Amino acid sequence: MSVEDYLERERVSDVRHEYVDGVALAMAGEKRVHNRLARRLVLLLERLADQLGCEVIVETVKVRTRDTRYRYPDFAVSCSAGDDPLYFANPCFIVEVLSDSTEHTDFGKKLDEYTRLPSLQRYVLVASDSRFVVVYRREGTRWTVESLEETGEFDVPCLETTVTLEQIYADVQF
């Protein structure tokens, strides 16, 4: 399937599909805690993003990681005026909420694809079964990684703010 066919079909589809080198891959539904964690990030960051002229997406807008790859992150921010109406090409911040069905891809192929995006400053993986977050930070031309468990915080440079694990996991029951 061509990129053009994929984008056209995805525009009218009730099911989300990621696109990897000519193949459309259906996205599975997730548990309520997964959705709650993604929505929590929206509540924390959307107003600030709006004030800074940035845009927040949650689960329903694609990120183009290569010419032939489109992924659906759980949460992303872009401050680029040049993004296409159908997808982000220049996100500065991406979050994936981990689940049994996505963890391997989130730590594997998506990690590789996302960290190749020149605009990306942070890639954050949020556990949905415990208070645990992995933060990948762009430091010049290299990436560093930090694991946060129970407490801690990470910065979101493009929004000039920090997020704590307490904010993300407030009232979340495992």
Q: What do the predicted segments below correspond to?
A:
Residues 1-174:
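Gly/Pro/Ser/Thr-rich low-complexity, intrinsically disordered segments predominantly at protein N-termini
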